[in-house]
């Protein structure tokens, strides 16, 4: 009996490290990071560096695939139907979940996904060319009361907010759709549109003096543009709270979830990712884990539904 007990104890002691080692073997093949916008915008710029950093941590290639359309709604639709058990994940903002389903029919819902981590706080700006006769948002409104204007949108949410502002102020405003920041920038710089939404691409052009941030759609001022007001400060009761996050289909294996979260936390402290995110695209880097992000997504969705009257 004594020998049997000792043998059992030995088996148990050996099993624990083997289990830990097994968890560290995931992933066993390359992964795919989905970006819901065209190449060249802030999400794409951040995502490609993030993919390299996660690849370093996970020991497998992380390939970036752009799936633009509908302010990332196309990418989320495809992700919801993905059965790759964690090998395919999305990096990007959350307005396609917290807003888009409120105003249009989509083939996914919040509970179709898990929100593993947030790595950056979204920067939602209204921008214009430095060559325009207006620089502040108040000046844009004053100009628009006397002249027809054009606005370049990127997401259904920024478009909805600007349409409401235009109605309040009596503006004659035409909307020009873009596939992301890379499509927005030449329109603004070439003065083909009067002003536009930017989720971060403006950070490439404001230091050179080519582009100006007129106001922020975020709830708080950007630490990178402390003198630029928010729409709420200007008297409009609209704001966007968003986080650049890692999102996966609901129900992926535990080992995949744990390793992806660990890779995200590793990236949040990585100098290369912090440099591209904060110094190049002007997004404050954070790390918020799954519990906090699951709560944030549902809280923002509920608040947005209340504002939209749903």
Pin down the residues of each PLM region.
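An extracytoplasmic/periplasmic, membrane-proximal ligand-sensing/linker region
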Residues: 28-30, 168, 254-310
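Short coil/turn segments
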Residues: 38-40, 94, 129-134, 153-157, ...
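Hinge/capping helix and adjacent helix->loop/strand transition within the periplasmic-binding protein
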Residues: 78-87, 101-183, 243-276
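C-terminal segment of classical bacterial N-terminal signal peptides
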Residues: 13-22
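Bacterial N-terminal signal peptides that target proteins for export
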Residues: 1-8
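N-terminal (or domain-start) structured segment
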Residues: 23-112, 157-158, 169-197, 204-206, ...
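Pocket-lining segment of extracytoplasmic ligand-binding domains
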Residues: 186-227, 234-235
């Amino acid at each position: 009996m004594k020998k049997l007990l000792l043998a059992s104890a030995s088996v148990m002691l050996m099993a624990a490290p083997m289990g830990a080692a097994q968890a560290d073997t995931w992933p066993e093949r390359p992964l795919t990071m989905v970006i819901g916008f065209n190449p060249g915008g802030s999400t794409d710029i951040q995502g490609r560096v993030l993919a390299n950093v996660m690849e370093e941590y996970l020991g497998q290639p992380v390939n970036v695939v752009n799936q633009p359309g509908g302010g990332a709604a196309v990418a989320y639709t495809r992700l919801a139907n993905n059965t790759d058990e964690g090998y395919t994940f999305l990096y990007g903002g959350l307005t396609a979940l917290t807003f888009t389903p409120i105003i249009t029919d989509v083939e996914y819902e919040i509970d179709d996904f898990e929100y593993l981590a947030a790595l950056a706080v979204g920067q939602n700006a209204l921008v214009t060319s430095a060559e325009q006769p207006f620089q502040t948002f108040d000046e844009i409104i004053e100009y628009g009361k006397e002249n027809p204007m054009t606005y370049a949108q990127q997401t259904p949410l920024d478009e909805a907010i600007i349409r409401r502002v235009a109605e309040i102020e009596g503006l004659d405003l035409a909307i020009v759709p873009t596939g992301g920041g890379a499509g927005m920038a030449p329109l603004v710089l070439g003065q083909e549109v009067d002003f536009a939404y930017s989720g971060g691409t403006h950070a490439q052009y404001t230091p050179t003096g080519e582009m100006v941030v007129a106001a922020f759609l975020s709830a708080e001022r950007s630490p990178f543009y402390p003198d630029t007001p928010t729409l709420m400060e200007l008297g409009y009761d609209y704001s966007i709270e968003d986080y650049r996050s890692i999102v996966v289909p609901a129900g992926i294996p535990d080992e995949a979830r744990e390793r992806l979260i660990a890779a995200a936390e590793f990236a949040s402290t990585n100098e290369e990712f912090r440099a591209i995110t904060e110094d190049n695209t002007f997004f404050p880097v954070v790390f918020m884990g799954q519990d906090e992000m699951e709560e944030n997504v549902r809280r923002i969705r509920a608040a947005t539904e209340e504002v939209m009257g749903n």
